[in-house]
Amino acid sequence: MYIIFRCDCGRALYSREGAKTRKCVCGRTVNVKDRRIFGRADDFEEASELVRKLQEEKYGSCHFTNPSKRE
């Protein structure tokens, strides 16, 4: 099980449930237990999709796509 949360910089992240900390790309070490949880996912693929959607809601589309999803 994975949980989805945000860093103080605003970036959406995911981590395994039970993990104590997670390192954000901004350099901060985030204490997972103190974060507001935005969602839960059963596997890492579902978690990464939820993170991608949260990022697009906040910052807009980045135009990077998975090659298997191109039409």
From Swiss-Prot:
Signal peptide: none annotated. Coiled coil: none annotated. It comes from the Archaea. Pfam families: DUF1922 (PF09082). Gene3D superfamilies: Structural Genomics, Unknown Function 30-nov-00 1gh9 Mol_id (3.90.820.10). This is Protein MTH_1184.
